[in-house]
From Swiss-Prot:
Coiled coil: none
Disulfide links within the chain: none
Start-end of DNA-binding region: 275-308
Name of the protein: Probable cell division protein WhiA
Record keywords: Cell cycle, Cell division, DNA-binding
Highest taxon in the source lineage: Bacteria
Gene Ontology MF: a single term: DNA binding
Known role: Involved in cell division and chromosome segregation.
Family per record: Belongs to the WhiA family.
Length: 327
């Protein structure tokens, strides 16, 4: 099941005991999923949702809280409609429901944001407002670089009201207009997790957090692997360059090179990929890596001084781009 469907399924099964919170959820769900229509001179309230369990929850809450019967119509997938949709409709008592839920103000005008009783309600009402909005038009993407919890809104006023509700819950949300559509977006991973819990989707939050953690572990492992590969490549290039310089040093010095420096140099040339520690173990008698490094450093220094005196290419001349490319 996709993350969005998981959240909506869990929220639809959530038991809410507070009447005020249940009213706030219904008002928000109707505002974000529905609309007011005039049919034969009467106000009809409709809400279109994408899961049957949401439609059944809304129908039950409308009856339990307000005593009005709602009818659920199923719109089967066909043509441009990819998925089955569910329309919850209250026709006979539409105007009364619209007034009681705050969709219409005292003068009978449509409310553009969220009803005043929801905006000025308790923290539990703010949680319920988000729950209703998410059930109506929410989405949650998989954890990742572009993960987001998002709600499509019927207008900028509703979007700003939802941002305000999030602020009351300690969550930073932003209102955006995307391709002519008003949306409220939460992108921070911690904020997404907190909001899921606030809405009542704790189980889905745990699943989302687990996937997020797994992704972060994989990303860290990949970074470390790339880092290790880069280090290995650098080490290999450095070893090849050192061997080439030592080879040139032995050519420059010829028979004048001291035996102990020549022995260290030959080890470097014969074991080009070995570390200094490994070269020390191969020496006879064995040496520390610092001793090996010191002898090779003195060998190169002697050779470069002689090359400068004689005006011939020094040890650095042996390190060519082609040599490093092949490393």
């Amino acid at each position: 099941m996709a993350m969005t469907a998981e959240v909506k399924d869990e929220l639809s099964r959530l038991v809410v005991n507070s009447v005020s919170a249940r009213r706030a959820e219904v008002a928000s769900l109707l505002r974000f999923a529905g609309g007011l229509h005039i049919v034969a001179g009467r106000v009809v309230v409709e809400a279109e949702v994408d899961l049957g369990i949401i439609a059944r929850r809304l129908r039950k809450d409308i009856y339990d809280l307000y005593g009005y019967n709602a009818v659920v119509h199923v719109l089967s997938a066909s043509g441009i409609r990819k998925n089955t949709r569910y329309v919850v409709r209250v026709a006979n008592d539409g105007e009364a429901l619209a007034r009681q839920t705050g969709l219409l103000d005292m003068r009978g005008r449509p409310v553009r944001g969220l009803p005043a009783q929801v905006v000025g309600g308790s923290v539990g009402d703010a949680e319920a407002a988000w729950r209703g909005a998410f059930l109506a038009h929410g989405s949650l993407t998989e954890p990742g670089r572009s993960s987001a919890l998002e709600v499509s809104c019927p207008g900028p006023e509703a979007a700003l009201a939802l941002v305000g509700a999030a602020r009351r819950l300690g969550v930073s949300a932003k209102a955006r207009e995307v391709r002519g559509s008003d949306r409220v977006v939460v992108r921070d991973g911690e904020a997404i997790g907190a909001l899921l819990t606030r809405m009542g989707a704790q189980d889905t939050r745990l699943t989302w957090e687990e996937r997020r953690m797994r992704r972060e572990v994989r990303a860290t492992a990949n970074r470390l692997a790339n880092f290790d590969d880069a280090n290995l490549r650098r080490s290999a290039r450095a070893a090849v360059a050192a061997a080439a310089r030592v080879e040139r040093a032995l050519e420059i010095l010829g028979d004048s090179v001291p035996d102990h420096l020549a022995a260290a140099g030959k080890l470097r040339v014969e074991h080009r990929q070995a570390s200094l520690e490994e070269l020390g173990r191969l020496a006879d008698p064995p040496m520390t890596k610092d001793a090996v490094a010191g002898r090779i450093r003195r060998l190169l220094s002697m050779a470069d001084r002689k090359a400068k005196q004689e005006g011939i290419p020094d040890t650095e001349s042996a390190v060519t781009p082609d040599l490093l490319d092949d490393a």
